[in-house]
Amino acid sequence: MHSFYLFLWIFFIYSFLGWCLEVCFFALNTGKFVNRGFLNGPVCPIYGFGVVIVVLCLTPLMENTLLLFLGSVLLTSLLELGVGFALEKLFHQRWWDYTNEPFNLGGYICLRFSLIWGVGATLVVKLIHPAIAALVGVVPHTAGVVLAVPVTALFVCDLVITVLGIAHMNQD
């Protein structure tokens, strides 16, 4: 079932899980809790977009792990490069910087994390996503739509508030 409804929930679920991953990774490395997201809420939209793109484009390759992995490396790297570049150009800030990593491209992407994202996306497509999609499918459609409205509204409000706040800071 590839529907807007399903992909909206996939986006929100993986945006939240990505935020959890980022916060935990940072906390383990620094001993500090820091909201690692672009937004104020507990979401990292790049993870949600990444999984939606990978699932849409690479599910047909699910049985060929090598092609799935290579496609995942390529798609997630292109997404991270594009988003990192766009965020810096639009808001004059970097949310990540791989400049000190070997084999980096402008500090936006690097080989180590491209390979990590490739492994992660491969595991998501093969192991995690089928369970998440089944979980979304268990929720009665009407209840899911009713719940999606305030979740989407909160996300959009957070996005607008964040963008306006950054724009205001950049004017100062």
Residue ranges of each PLM-predicted region?
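Aromatic-rich, lipid-facing transmembrane alpha helices and their immediate juxtamembrane interface loops
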Residues: 1-172
